[in-house]
A protein has these predicted regions:
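N-terminal, membrane-interfacial amphipathic/helix-forming hydrophobic leader that caps
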Residues: 1-124
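Transmembrane helix-loop-helix hairpins at the membrane interface
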Residues: 7-10, 14, 162-265
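Residue-level signature of transmembrane alpha-helical entry/exit and packing/kink sites
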Residues: 40-48, 77-88, 124-129, 179-184, ...
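Short helix-kink/termination motifs in transmembrane helices of multi-pass secondary transporters
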Residues: 53, 57, 137, 141, ...
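Membrane-interfacial segments
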Residues: 63-70, 102-111, 146-151, 155, ...
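Juxtamembrane helix-loop-helix connectors linking adjacent transmembrane helices
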Residues: 68-79, 109-191
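Structural signal for membrane-spanning alpha-helices in multi-pass inner-membrane proteins
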Residues: 95-104, 139-140, 222, 226, ...
Length: 265
C-alpha cells in the first residue's frame, strides 16, 4: 500500500469519525427491547401511521368534522388546534412512556435512557449539525423548486388526497401561523420534541429488526404518516431521509430535535 493510499484512508477515517458517533447505551436498548413475533413487528410498523390516520379522520372527513363542531362548539381552527395538541403532546410524548412501561416493563428512569432524554451529544449539536444543515440546505433549495412543486401540484389534483378548505394545513401559512404566539410555542414543542421522541427516540429502535434499511424506512414512514396534508408533505419524501441518516450517524435525540427545528423554520 502506497503512502498516498494510506493518507487517503486516514482522511476517510477522520471524516467518518467526525460524523459517526457510537453510543453503547443506544445499542443496548436497541437489542434488548426488540419485538420477537411477526405480529409484534407489524404492530410497531402500524404505530408509525396511527397518529396520522387519526388526524386525517378527525380533520379531513367532513361528516366527522362537522359532528365534532356541533358537539364541542369550537371554531374550526381551534378544534384542529386541540386535536394537534392531543396528538403531539399526548400521543407522541406520552405513549412511548406508557408502552415502555406496559410492554417492556421499564421504569421511568429506564424509559428516559431508552428514549435518549438522559444524555446529549454536544459535538453533534455544535460541530456536526451546522455542517449537516448546510449540506441539507444546498440540496433542499433546488429540490423544492424542481421536485416538490410539480409533485405537490399533481397530488393536489387527486381527489382522494384533497385537503379540505377548512383545514389549517391547506398550504397557506396564515392558516397555521395565525394562532397567538403562546399557542404556536406549545404546538411547536409538541411538533419538534414530540415527533422526534416518538419516531426517532422510540420507534426507530423498535424497528431495528429492519437491519440496515431501518435508517431509510423510518423517515419514509414518518413522511407517509402525514395523511392529513398529503399534497404538501409527501412530496418532501426525498428530503426526509436526512432525519434517519442523522439519527444513524449521531444516535442522539437532541440533535434530531434541533435539526427538526431548523428544517421547519
Amino acid at each position: 500500500m502506497t503512502h498516498t493510499e494510506d493518507e487517503h484512508k486516514f482522511r476517510q477515517g477522520r471524516m467518518a469519525s467526525f460524523f459517526k458517533r457510537e453510543d453503547p447505551t443506544y445499542d443496548r436498548w436497541e437489542r434488548t427491547c426488540q419485538p420477537k413475533s411477526a405480529l409484534g413487528k407489524g404492530a410497531y410498523l402500524a404505530l408509525y401511521f396511527l397518529p396520522g390516520l387519526l388526524a386525517a379522520i378527525v380533520i379531513n372527513v367532513p361528516a366527522v368534522f362537522s359532528t365534532e363542531l356541533r358537539i364541542t362548539h369550537l371554531s374550526p381552527r381551534y378544534l384542529q388546534f386541540g386535536w394537534l395538541l392531543i396528538i403531539t403532546l399526548g400521543w407522541h410524548l406520552l405513549s412511548p412512556f406508557i408502552f415502555l412501561r406496559l410492554l417492556d416493563g421499564l421504569t421511568i428512569r429506564e424509559s428516559l435512557s431508552y428514549l435518549g432524554l438522559d444524555r446529549i451529544d454536544l459535538k453533534g449539536i455544535f460541530a456536526v449539525l451546522p455542517v449537516f444543515c448546510f449540506a441539507f440546505a444546498l440540496v433542499s433549495v433546488p429540490y423544492i423548486q424542481f421536485v416538490w412543486t410539480p409533485l405537490s401540484t399533481f397530488l393536489q389534483a387527486v381527489p382522494l388526497f384533497h385537503v379540505p378548505p377548512w383545514s389549517i394545513f391547506g398550504g397557506d401559512p396564515a392558516g397555521l401561523y395565525a394562532f397567538p404566539p403562546y399557542a404556536l410555542a406549545v404546538l411547536f414543542v409538541g411538533n419538534f420534541v414530540g415527533e422526534e421522541l416518538y419516531y426517532r427516540g422510540y420507534l426507530m429502535k423498535k424497528t431495528s429488526f429492519l437491519g440496515r434499511a431501518n435508517w431509510f424506512v423510518n423517515p419514509l414512514l414518518f413522511a407517509l404518516y402525514h395523511l392529513w396534508q398529503i399534497p404538501f408533505t409527501w412530496p418532501l419524501i426525498g428530503l426526509v431521509f436526512a432525519f434517519g441518516l442523522l439519527m444513524w450517524l449521531r444516535k442522539d435525540l437532541y440533535v434530531l430535535i434541533a435539526f427538526h427545528f431548523f428544517v421547519n423554520m
